[in-house]
């Protein structure tokens, strides 16, 4: 008789109530606990990326999406494909280079769908039998689903999305959109480490930091006999419209003001001088889109604004003259070194 294999005891037990998960390694338990706490102890350090992960392995795999590296190369002759993980490479080899894979066919009448895994076939067949064996475990909820993925998506409505920006913040969003809205409104302010200016978004701070570089890209005005240079395309466009095209179509309607501007953003920023307590510019609400619409990649066309019946003289002059920002290219001229 052969020797008995040693029994592996799962001695790492989840301490959360109503959770019976057990593991044979502590690191697996620690990763599991993050599902209860919402923690992501391994954050991505790339600028502008706010993603976090429950394991170092998942973080290292994510970093490859920033670097573009694909260290796992297919060793099959005449195949030059490479992958970010060994598991993806093995899956590719199995599908593309091994003998024809076994397929599982649905035997229900007029169906015949094929699946690579028996479990996929089994879940698919629940559609034909009208079974919903995956039940929500949340107390007081009796909803059932035909697949684990649909159940998992539903359970998020109970668990929610806890705020990870501040450990003392008690906010829990019912949906990911609620969480993102909360984070943008209350936790998105970032500070420049050089001049202490604050910004609502990391992208704004990233653009601002360019002014502190010893070497920066500058844009020269393309108009003849004009040597003005600017550090942003926005300022160059504003210069062309204001000084070369004499276009200042955006008029401040505040009583006793009447200042005009070449760019709408400049007018919006100017409004704050009349209302110093205004924290931020109000953006028009965006139309609500379903999750399926966003995942499909479809981008709805922007609706054209209706022309107002009354216009200021400055607005009328804009319609009669060409758009200088479209007519002139805005080339990068040189790297300016500050001494």
UniProtKB/Swiss-Prot annotation:
Biased composition (Basic residues): 299-309
Main location group: nucleus
Keyword Chaperone in record: no
Molecular function as annotated in GO: DNA binding; RNA binding; zinc ion binding
One Pfam short name: TFIIIA_zf-C2H2
Gene Ontology BP terms: ribosomal large subunit biogenesis
Bias (Polar residues) ranges: 311-323
Subcellular location: Nucleus
Positions of the UniProt region annotated as Disordered: 271-339
ZnF start-end (C2H2-type): 12-36, 42-66, 72-97, 104-128, 134-158, 161-187, 190-212, 219-244, 250-274
Lineage top rank: taxon: Eukaryota
Assigned keywords, A-Z: DNA-binding, Metal-binding, Nucleus, Repeat, Ribosome biogenesis, RNA-binding, Transcription, Transcription regulation, Zinc, Zinc-finger
A GO cellular component annotation in the UniProt record: nucleus
Protein function: Involved in ribosomal large subunit biogenesis. Interacts with the internal control region (ICR) of approximately 50 bases within the 5S RNA genes, is required for correct transcription of these genes by RNA polymerase III. Also binds the transcribed 5S RNA's.
Protein name, entry field: Transcription factor IIIA
Organism from which the protein derives: Anaxyrus americanus (American toad)
Gene that encodes the chain: gtf3a
